[in-house]
Amino acid sequence: MTLEQVTRRYVGKFLQKHNNGQNQIFRNWPAEYALDGWYIKMLSGGDITAHVHQGWLSGTFYVRVPAKKENDAGNIEFTLHAWDLPVVRDDFPRRIVATKPGRLVLFPSSLPHRVLPFSEGQERISIAFDIIPKSNQVVPPQAPA
């Protein structure tokens, strides 16, 4: 199987598991979507500052990660406190997901995330992607159906 096929299968299982009709992103899920992907190669001392994406759902597949000398070094962090902006609801705790080769992590594209700094002298290689609806009429995931 190609990485795209594995990713689409994983996304399908993710949707089946989480589509309980309560979440707008799943209620308005497009019949067809594109995967817009890129690879990221980082060396010792690397980090990626907090950011969001323009897709509906984003993901990262970890190819190679350095052996960790520090607990969270090189891991991915999700938080609503990424910038100096007011937080209306503070019921989403900071969450750190450990990276390991072969792990695929999916998350809403609008959720701020970053790569925590690492200093190990090894490469960190990942493949990131956004899921973008293929449609002439795009309904934002937060809009009512």
Which residue stretches match the model-derived regions?
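Catalytic core of non-heme Fe(II) oxygenases with the double-stranded beta-helix
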Residues: T2-R8, G12-L106, S110-S126, D130-P141
